[in-house]
Structure formats: C-alpha cells, structure tokens
Amino acid sequence: AIATSELAAAAERVAQVVPSAEIAAICMDRERLRVLAHEELGLPTTPYRFAGSLEELREGAQIVGYPCVVKPIMSSSGHGQSVVRSAEAIDAAWTEAQEGRRAHDEGDVSRVIVEALAPLDYELTVLTVSSSAGIVTCAPIGQRQESGDYRESWQPATFTPDVLEQAQHIARTAVEGLVAKAKASGEKGWGVFGVELFVLTDGSVLFNEVSPRPHDTGMVT
C-alpha cells in the first residue's frame, strides 16, 4: 500500500514527487480508477457494478451475471478477491472482501466491485512512461499465473498486430487520463506505470488496472 497522505505532504516540501499523490490515490482505488477509465475515457472493460452493502452486491451480481468476480475497492495482491459462480456464494464473497480489504476511510464497511468473468485468453502488462518528453509505451509484457499467483513475465510477448494496437492505445489513454488528473491537482503526473490488460478469446483487449509503478509483472531484465 502507498501512504498517499505522506506523498502529498512530501510534495509540499519538495519540488516534485513521483508518482504524484493524486495518481497514486486513484490507482489504489478501483472505483475511482474504473470510473476514470471506462466512464470518463471510454476504455473497454468487463461489465461491472459497485456495492457498499451485501444487498447491493446481490443486485450487482444479478446485473453483471454469473460467474463474476468480487474484489474490495482497496486491496492488493489478490487479497479479498473471489470468483462467484452462483447467488448462493455471494454472502461468502462479501465476507472475503471485507476481510481482505485495506483500511478505508468510510468506516467498517468497505465498498466492492463486482465484474463479469471475461472469457480470458491471456493477460498483458504495458509499461508506460510519462515524463517532460511526453508519454511512451513499451513493448507489452506477457505473464503467467497459477491459481491467481504471479509466476513469470517475458518481453516482448507474442501477439497479433491488432492486439498490440489495442494494448498501446488503452495504455496511453489510461495514463493520459491519470496525468490530466494530476495536472488538475497542480502536479506534473510523471512516472512509470504498469497498465494491466485482459486479452479475450476473440482478440479484443480490455482495461483492467494501473499500478503507479512497473508492477510485479513488469520486473523484467
């Protein structure tokens, strides 16, 4: 977890903090990040709903359909996440999300996101750099996971030209949106970002999340 309040305090004492406190805060909050990516920037994502109670989660899961994935708005490394295959498992998913969440400023109850389980082919990470020279995307990085645990990465990954074009467009657009938010807060928005993407079995690419750092999957040499 990133202490965004400490980043903000440091930014008041020095010329610049990278990543900016505003960008780090957005990336740590799945609700703010998904609203920015999909609702403001128009990037493709899985169908989703947000919920602040068990009843809202039941309603959201019914809308996105089963199977679905439930995640705390604020968590990392898969903590609190679960795949829900029927309405009977919703209560357990809610409990899992509450136990796996980070400390949240709304009190004892943490909000969650419930999203459809996409027909995933593989995942990609696009390292994207924002600096005074502009925004640059690196060659996408392939990754392999086992039972939800990250195992290995390789760069460049093998994919079609169409997937490459989609991946680079989504990564650049997402980081441009984050930089705009940082600039609106008086920050420059520079940094290295790990943009995580889903590639579906039909070849389409969906936005997943952004880390305000290279991300574990981006640690290639």
Describe these PLM feature segments.
Residues 211-221:
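Glycine-rich phosphate/pyrophosphate-binding beta-alpha loops
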Residues 1-64, 76:
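Conserved N-proximal alpha/beta basic substrate-recognition cap immediately N-terminal to
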Residues 128, 204-213:
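A short beta-strand motif that forms the metal-chelation/ATP-contact edge
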Residues 84-192, 199-201:
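Internal nucleotide-binding/catalytic subdomain
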